[in-house]
Amino acid sequence: MTTDTIVAQATAPGRGGVGIIRISGDKATDVAMAVLGHLPKTRYADYCDFKNATGQVIDQGIALFFKGPNSFTGEDVLELQGHGGQIVLDMLIKRVLEVEGIRIAKPGEFSEQAFMNDKLDLTQAEAIADLIDATSEQAAKSALQSLQGEFSKEVHELVDQVTNLRLYVEAAIDFPDEEVDFLSDGKIANALYKIIDKLSTVQASAKQGSIIREGMKVVIAGRPNAGKSSLLNALAGKESAIVTEIAGTTRDVLREHIHLDGMPLHIIDTAGLRDTTDTVEQIGIERAWNEINSADRVLFMVDGTTTDAVDPHDIWPDFINRLPANLGVTVIRNKADLTGENLDMTEEKGYSVYRISAKTGLGVDELKLHLKSLMGYQSNLEGGFIARRRHLEALDVAASHLQLGKEQLEVYLAGELLAEELRMAQIALSEITGRFTSDDLLGKIFSSFCIGK
């Protein structure tokens, strides 16, 4: 990281009541002397004139000075809070840039300074952007929890446990007790199992946090003419898909992005699944399976007039058996207006079964509540945190190494290989908070931030 002093507008561009210019770095004091004529008392609000190089007043407002390292960035920080007209703010930034050694900040560079100066870790820095971009109350609360260190705390605890176990294994290898076989005495195995269990819990929370941040991808799938497109239209609240009585009308993937009480939901309507010799329809079915395999949830659409079954294994075993092992499935028995079924939800062998009429809209509101619940809308979010895809990937890598380490211990009693898998898990977990992170990744993360953050 450079030692340049940087400046940027901290408030959103455009017209507003208040506009804030932020300066961070060693030259912040020089800016204060040039623009204000004095250095404000540290951490006190100072109402004063903001002047150009000839002494003319550009604006009037509040100046705040924070002496490093006791600032957000860890550097000397000066904030000039004036009126929110864009012309005035541009004039003020131009004046600041006249001071030698000042340059415009890159996107996210203030947060990057804070990260480099150990004022916050990478998950907390990312949480700043997530809090700004939050599209729901749940997302905002979870982002704030991450900003306050809840996610970091969980990861640090895992890193410490993995590190301690690794050091114990390595020490036992280097200084063996001839009377005790340390690999088979149960102590290491018990510690490893506890770490794996805790990691599994953190993965589940991170998965929920990722859904709250990025939205849940829901794929509507089933046989032709089951009412999939009608359900897409009912959930979207508009005629997004063409609906006819002709089986196979939908041949390509249709997407709708909606919000349920602020919770982002990505709905995918797919071609009806069946054996066909039609080349175009075959392509649509192949695309349907691609969407299913990357879904967070599948709505298995069933024409209720064709079967009384509710267990998906009885309805279409080949379809269920082809689904990814951990993919959640909700069974939708459609056309309840024709079958006369009660519009209710039941649990059948671990599956939620909803009875609706996509055509008339009956039961769709209950289904929406179900989808909101899956996204965490009704959950108690105390202690919950926001998570990104890269966090999930790092947790998955760590889990994979721990499972490999478990195999080395249980099957081969290979202490050296167990220690190596623990080391790799430690690195994967440390990438989440930025303890071990490449410069390329840091650049990618911070470049997605706002200029003044």
UniProtKB/Swiss-Prot annotation:
Q: What is its EC number?
A: 3.6.-.-
Q: Answer yes or no on keyword GTP-binding.
A: yes
Residue positions binding GTP: 225-230, 244-250, 269-272, 334-337
Q: Which SUPFAM superfamilies match?
A: P-loop containing nucleoside triphosphate hydrolases, TrmE connector domain
Q: Which GO terms describe its cellular component?
A: cytosol
Keywords for this protein: Cytoplasm, GTP-binding, Hydrolase, Magnesium, Metal-binding, Nucleotide-binding, Potassium, tRNA processing
- Gene Ontology molecular function, alphabetical: GTP binding; GTPase activity; metal ion binding
Compartments (UniProt record): Cytoplasm
Segment forming the signal sequence: none
Q: What is its main location?
A: cytoplasm
Which Pfam families did the record assign?
MMR_HSR1, MnmE_helical, TrmE_N
- Tell me which residues bind K(+): 225, 244, 246, 249
Q: Which Gene3D superfamilies match?
A: P-loop containing nucleotide triphosphate hydrolases, Probable tRNA modification gtpase trme, domain 1, tRNA modification GTPase MnmE domain 2
Protein task: Exhibits a very high intrinsic GTPase hydrolysis rate. Involved in the addition of a carboxymethylaminomethyl (cmnm) group at the wobble position (U34) of certain tRNAs, forming tRNA-cmnm(5)s(2)U34.
HAMAP family listed in its UniProt record: GTPase_MnmE
Similarity comment: Belongs to the TRAFAC class TrmE-Era-EngA-EngB-Septin-like GTPase superfamily. TrmE GTPase family.
Give the NCBIfam families listed for this entry: mnmE_trmE_thdF, PRK05291.1-3, small_GTP
Question: What quaternary structure, including any partners, is listed in this protein's UniProt entry?
Answer: Homodimer. Heterotetramer of two MnmE and two MnmG subunits.
- The name of this protein is tRNA modification GTPase MnmE
> What is the scientific name of the source organism?
Shewanella sp. (strain W3-18-1)
